Amino acid sequence: MNDLVIHGALIVDGSGSEPAIGDVAVRDGVITAVCQPGLTAAEVVDAEGLVLAPGIVDIHTHYDAQLTWDAGASPSPQMGVTTVVVGNCGFGLEIGRASCRERV
């Protein structure tokens, strides 16, 4: 059984195909089904009227210094960004910190 079903969202999958309204199932943190009818789960989230899309990778940021006090790189998560690239302007404090190497 799935842990979570996100029901009725407008699904934009990032492939370039037309968005479609449907359900997405998740089990153990992994997407197991997209747009299949009859999905069930322990928890169902009603996403009608909302858009569901993959996380965005921001390849040009200026978070280099900010990451030393704001590991969440806010406000990126509120805008759908799940991964940021730093150091692309020749300045990267975060990369040199031993405590941050797991995130690099």
List PLM regions with ranges:
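Flexible loop/turn segments at secondary-structure boundaries
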Residues: D13, D64, F91-E94
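Activation segment
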Residues: S15, C35, A65-L67, V85
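Di-metal (Zn2+ and/or Mg2+/Mn2+) metal-binding site signature of metallo-dependent hydrolases
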Residues: V51-P75
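Divalent-metal coordination cores built from histidine and acidic residues
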Residues: W69-R103
